[in-house]
């Protein structure tokens, strides 16, 4: 089942902990709270997210990464809909991450990640319908610490996600450029932003991005007489964000915007 919503106000609050050698691929730890009320409606979308990755150094500049991520999505649907909303009230997305990254040469780091996923309402026992497989391979050229006028980072990759409905990998591109001491730009999907740095602690950013979810309904619902086994939501978000760096590796984010 797909449902489109507009005029949604979004707020996010999260903590992120990262290690510089691995931050190009993933955070090491993250806590996040998202709240999205629907405009002119009592409907609400709330997401709680927790992420933890544990890197194991195998050799110099080589890491094996094990981790997991849990998303709990709470849908408070108060409007009248032509279907039973009770089975949709709580969704769970659980990822298990296995990754490996190493320096290919002086300029390029290579990484790969496999992510088995459980995405379901979890009303009953887990079945094969609740299981999905995601993954990706990436090449990163990071010159942010280089002694050049405009440091940059380029990430190229291929990602595979069984929930997209496309049986082939999709390209991934992200480009970051430090324009000057106060400004930086990041272009890519699912998020692009322009950031202004007041100092080493405080920064403000304008961003656009994509968000959403896909999950299996263990207790199917019916829409216009047809059985529906899955639910998905895709949103485009634009807004402003504020970052506060407690340390080089611990960051507080707050975001507000609309879709």
Regions found by a protein language model. Name each.
Residues 58-65, 107-110, 144-154, 182-185, ...:
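Repeated loop/turn-to-beta-strand initiation elements of outer-membrane beta-barrel proteins
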Residues 33-39, 68-76, 102, 116-122, ...:
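Transmembrane beta-strands of outer-membrane beta-barrel pores
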Residues 29-31, 64-68, 112-114, 154-156, ...:
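Membrane-embedded beta-strand positions of outer-membrane beta-barrel proteins
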Residues 68-94, 102, 190-259:
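Outer-membrane beta-barrel translocator/channel fold
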Residues 39-45, 123-129, 160-169, 182-198:
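Solvent-exposed loop/turn segments connecting transmembrane beta-strands
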Residues 50-54, 96-102, 135-141, 158, ...:
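Residues on the lipid-exposed face of transmembrane beta-strands in outer-membrane beta-barrel proteins
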Residues 44-48, 88-94, 127-135, 167-171, ...:
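Residues that define the transmembrane beta-barrel architecture of outer-membrane proteins
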Residues 23-80:
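Short glycine/proline- and aromatic-enriched beta-strand/turn motifs that initiate or cap beta-hairpins
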């Amino acid at each position: 089942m797909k449902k489109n919503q507009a005029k949604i106000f979004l707020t996010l609050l999260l903590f992120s902990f990262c290690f510089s050698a691995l931050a190009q691929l993933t955070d090491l730890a993250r806590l996040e709270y998202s709240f999205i009320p629907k405009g002119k409606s009592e409907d609400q979308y709330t997401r709680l997210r927790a992420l933890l990755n544990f890197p194991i150094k195998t050799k110099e500049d080589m890491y094996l990464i094990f981790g997991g991520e849990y998303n709990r999505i709470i849908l408070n649907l108060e409007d009248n809909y032509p279907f039973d909303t009770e089975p949709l009230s709580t969704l769970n997305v659980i990822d298990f991450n296995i990754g490996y990254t190493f320096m290919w040469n002086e300029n390029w780091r290579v990484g790969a990640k496999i992510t088995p996923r459980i995405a379901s309402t979890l009303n009953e026992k887990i079945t094969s319908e609740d299981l999905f497989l995601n993954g990706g391979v990436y090449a990163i050229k990071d010159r942010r610490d280089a002694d050049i006028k405009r440091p940059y980072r380029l990430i190229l990759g291929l990602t595979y996600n069984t929930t997209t409905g496309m049986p082939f990998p999709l390209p991934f591109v992200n480009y970051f450029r430090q324009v000057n001491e106060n400004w930086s730009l990041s272009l890519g999907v699912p998020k692009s932003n322009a950031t202004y740095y007041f100092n080493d602690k405080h920064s403000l950013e304008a961003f656009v991005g994509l968000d959403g979810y896909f999950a299996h309904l263990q207790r199917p619902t019916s829409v216009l007489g047809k059985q529906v086994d899955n639910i998905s939501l895709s949103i485009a978000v634009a807004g402003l964000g504020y970052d506060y760096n407690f340390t080089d590796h611990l960051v507080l984010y707050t975001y507000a915007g609309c879709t």
